[in-house]
Amino acid sequence: MNLKNGLLLFILFLDCVFFKVESKCVKGCDVALASYYIIPSIQLRNISNFMQSKIVLTNSFDVIMSYNRDVVFDKSGLISYTRINVPFPCECIGGEFLGHVFEYTTKEGDDYDLIANTYYASLTTVELLKKFNSYDPNHIPVKAKINVTVICSCGNSQISKDYGLFVTYPLRSDDTLAKIATKAGLDEGLIQNFNQDANFSIGSGIVFIPGRDQNGHFFPLYSRTGIAKGSAVGIAMAGIFGLLLFVIYIYAKYFQKKEEEKTKLPQTSRAFSTQDASGSAEYETSGSSGHATGSAAGLTGIMVAKSTEFTYQELAKATNNFSLDNKIGQGGFGAVYYAELRGEKTAIKKMDVQASSEFLCELKVLTHVHHLNLVRLIGYCVEGSLFLVYEHIDNGNLGQYLHGIGTEPLPWSSRVQIALDSARGLEYIHEHTVPVYIHRDVKSANILIDKNLRGKVADFGLTKLIEVGNSTLHTRLVGTFGYMPPEYAQYGDVSPKIDVYAFGVVLYELITAKNAVLKTGESVAESKGLVQLFEEALHRMDPLEGLRKLVDPRLKENYPIDSVLKMAQLGRACTRDNPLLRPSMRSIVVALMTLSSPTEDCDDDSSYENQSLINLLSTR
C-alpha cells in the first residue's frame, strides 16, 4: 500500500469513527407538548386515544384539560379550528433524535396521509410513517399497529436556560412568526433562535415553541449532569484535531519505514493466504498471527492482515472496465462484478466514496473474522472509488433460489443444511469474537449458496460491534423491513437478538419460499409479514394443516411435515416480541443440528444452554 492510499484509508476510518456521530441524543425530558389542530370531526376522546402515552391514558381528559384551561372548558366539546397542547414523553429514540412513538391501530380506508395529517394533525409526516413501519403505503391492512413518531425538543442551554418545556408546533398556512410570538407571549427573536433554519411563512413543517406548564408558567431548563453540549463538542473537536495531526505525522513516518522494508520481503509474504481462510474449519480472530499486507495492519482499529490491496487498473482490466456483461448484482451500497483475479474467481463490489462507513465496517469485520460459513474477503482497493474483492460464490444468494423464476426448487434437506450453515456463521460472530459483532441485515439475499448448496453469510456493511458484557446499544435505524424486531424498529435497541429475529424470518422463507413481507387477501390487496402468517398457522387447532398451506408448493409432497413443524417452531421462538425470550444463535445451531441429523451427538456445552428448545424440536 502506498502512502497516498494509506492516508486515504486512515482518513476514511477517522471519518467513520469521529464524524458520523453528530446529531446524537443521550436522554430526553419528562414531558413535551404537542400542538394539536382541531377539526370538526375530532373530539377530546379521539385525541386522548391517538396521543395515548404514560402521561395521557386512554379516555383520560383531565391531564389534557389541565394544560389548556383557557381553551377547553368542557370534556364533551372542543372549539374547532383552534389548537390545544397535549403532553407526551420526550425520549431519546435510538440515540439519534428526541421524540415519542405512539401506536395507532388502523381501520378500513386508512392511509399514511390520513393518519399523519388528520388523526395526528401534521405532528408527524408520511415520510416518518414509511420509515418506521414496514407496510406498503398503498395497502395498509386493517387493524395493523402503526408506529407514529412525533419529534420534540427539551430546550437549548446555549440559547436560554429559562425555557425547558417546548411545544412541537406544526406550521399552517395562516401562521407567521409574529402571530405565533404574540400568542405565546414571547419575543420573535427568541423563537427564531430556537428554530434557526425554520421558515415560519412556508405553511408546513415543525417548529419548537417554549410552552407553559399546567399553572400557566414557563418551565426552566434544568441543568443536566456533565459538560454543556457546546463545551463538550468544542473540547472533543479540539482534542480530535490535535490527535489527528499527531497520528498523521506518526502514520506517515510509519509508512515511509514500511515502504523501505517492503522491498526486502518476499512477494509471497504479502499475498492472501487462501489456505488459511477458504476451507479450514479453524477460526481466526485478531489475535491470530500472520504476515501483514503492506502497511495497513498498523492502522488503529482496522486490520487488513489477510487482504490484498489491488490497483484500480487491475480491477478494471479483470472486469472489462466494469462492463454490464460482468455485472452480476446490485446492492444498496454498490454494484457487484464478476472477475478472475490472479487465478481465482472473484466478486468485486464497487462502492461510492460516500459509502465509506459501510466500506470500512465490512473491511474491518471480514479481515478480523474468518469462518467457513462467512464469505471470504480477498482484498480491497481505494483508488477512485471503494472496492471490496470477495471469493465468488457460484450459485448466487438464497433469496434468488427461493423467490427466483425458473430456478430449481431447493430440496428440503438442503434448506435445513443452509439454515444450519448460516446459523453457524452468525453464532461465530456473536459468541466467538471479541468484540461481539451484530450483522443487522440478516436476510435471504445476504446468504450465499456455493456449488455444494452450502450457505455463507455475506454483506457485513451494516455490522455493529459491542464490547463483551454490554447487552444492548442504541443506534440509527438500518436494515430491511420485514426482518426488524419490534425493539429495533421502535427504539433502535441493538443486541445479538435482532439477528436472531431476522434469522427466524429466514427460516420462514425457507419453508414457504415467500418474501418476508407479501401481499395477501382475497378481495382487497394488503400486506402481511411472514411472522404474522406463521403465528396464525401455529395457533390453529391443527397447526399441521395450516403449515401445509404455507409450505413451498414446488416441494410438492417431498418434505417431512414433522421437520417443517420443528423448523416453524424454531422460527417462532426466534421471532418472539420479547428479545430476552429468544434463543441464542448457539441454541439455534444445536436445534438445527438435531433437525438435520437426529442421531448426531451435540457437545455438552451447547446442549445445556436451552434444553427446552431442544426438547421442543425433538418431540411433537
Curated annotation (Swiss-Prot):
It catalyses: L-seryl-[protein] + ATP = O-phospho-L-seryl-[protein] + ADP + H(+); L-threonyl-[protein] + ATP = O-phospho-L-threonyl-[protein] + ADP + H(+). One of its GO terms (molecular function) is ATP binding. Putative receptor for S.meliloti Nod factor signals essential for the establishment of the nitrogen-fixing, root nodule symbiosis with S.meliloti. Involved in the control of root hair curling after S.meliloti infection, probably by modulating the reorganization of the microtubular cytoskeleton in epidermal and cortical cells. Regulates a subset of Nod factor-induced genes. One of its GO terms (biological process) is nodulation. Residues 265-278 have a biased composition (Polar residues). The lineage of its organism: Eukaryota, Viridiplantae, Streptophyta, Embryophyta, Tracheophyta. Disulfide bonds join C25-C92, C29-C154, C90-C152. This is LysM domain receptor-like kinase 3.
